[in-house]
């Protein structure tokens, strides 16, 4: 089945992204309201579909741990590998890392070598920063066990569209149809959800 690997309209500066997120570690939990909502909804969905304990989990783009903490509480993984492009994010997991419950791999998930044999690969609010999510989907398939799960959330084309229209800059967001086309090559799609979220708490 053919697939179109889409080229970014604008290059993504990973070094700039790393610097900006590194500076935001202390304020992230306060500012990332939408990301927190998304992580909690993802946790609820995973809790519905996945067996427990889940075995080996790889989380891409862990951030400060919105999803990580829920995974520990609900899926009880035997081994948890956390990844974020910012090394500074590891400071949010000193308890998990110190106890040996998790390991942390800092770096660009599109090129970083990850351990194979995962029962679940999960990512919340990170794939919009990738140069080629399609190639990453393919790669994740090689890291999963047979009958393993790949679950992710990303932002759609309505995200910050007003800002992009004014500034003329922004990320190239895949449509739901484009994502599904790329996923069907390697995965059986269990469920898809598209939700509008509030960016700020009131």
Language model segments and positions:
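A short acidic, Gly/Pro-enriched loop at the edge of an enzyme's catalytic core
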Residues: 110-121
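A short SAM/SAH-binding and catalytic strip from SAM-dependent methyltransferases
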Residues: 120-132
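N-terminal, positively charged/glycine-rich alpha-helical extensions of SAM-dependent methyltransferases
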Residues: 5-26
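Conserved alpha-helix/loop element of class I SAM-dependent methyltransferases that forms part
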Residues: 34-53
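Class I SAM-dependent methyltransferase SAM/SAH-binding core
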Residues: 58-112
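A short glycine-rich, Lys/Arg-flanked "PGG" loop and its adjoining helix->strand segment in the class I
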Residues: 134-146
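Conserved small/polar residues in nucleotide/adenosyl-binding loops
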Residues: 195-202
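Conserved class I S-adenosyl-L-methionine
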Residues: 149-178
């Amino acid at each position: 089945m053919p697939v179109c690997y889409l080229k970014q309209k604008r290059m993504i500066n990973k070094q700039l992204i790393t610097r900006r997120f590194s500076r935001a570690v202390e304020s992230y939990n306060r500012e990332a309201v939408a990301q927190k909502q998304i992580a909690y909804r993802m946790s609820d969905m995973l809790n519905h579909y996945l067996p427990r304990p889940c075995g080996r989990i790889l989380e891409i783009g862990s951030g400060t741990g919105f999803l990580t903490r829920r995974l520990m509480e609900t899926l009880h993984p035997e081994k948890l590998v956390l990844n974020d492009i910012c090394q500074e994010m590891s400071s949010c997991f000193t308890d998990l890392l110190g106890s040996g419950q998790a390991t942390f791999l800092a770096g660009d998930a599109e090129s970083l070598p990850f351990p194979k044999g995962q029962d679940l690969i999960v990512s919340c609010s990170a794939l919009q920063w990738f140069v080629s999510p399609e190639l990453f989907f393919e790669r994740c398939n090689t890291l999963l066990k047979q009958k393993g799960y790949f679950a992710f959330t990303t932002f759609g084309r309505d995200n910050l569209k007003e800002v992009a229209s004014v500034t003329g800059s922004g990320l190239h967001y895949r449509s739901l149809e484009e994502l599904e086309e790329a996923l069907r090559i390697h995965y059986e799609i269990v469920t898809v959800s598209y939700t509008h979220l509030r960016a700020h708490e009131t």
